[in-house]
Swiss-Prot record:
Organism: Christiangramia forsetii (strain DSM 17595 / CGMCC 1.15422 / KT0803)
Biological classification of the source: Bacteria, Pseudomonadati, Bacteroidota, Flavobacteriia, Flavobacteriales
Topology of the protein relative to the lipid bilayer: Multi-pass membrane protein
Localization terms from the record: Cell membrane
Protein name, per record: UPF0391 membrane protein GFO_1615
Top-level taxon: Bacteria
TM helices/strands, residue ranges: 4-24, 27-47
Amino acid sequence: MVRLIVIFLIIAIIAAIFGFGGVAEGAADIAKIIFYIFLVLLVISVLSRLFRK
């Protein structure tokens, strides 16, 4: 149990360093782009499924 606490503490510290250091901003921009790409792919998939029937 103590091992999990230490692991989560280390992960939290690393996340804080990335979050406060500005590294997360670049990752967030990439995540937004990927989100919109997959949203468009979802809409295309749903529409093609509807028109196929």
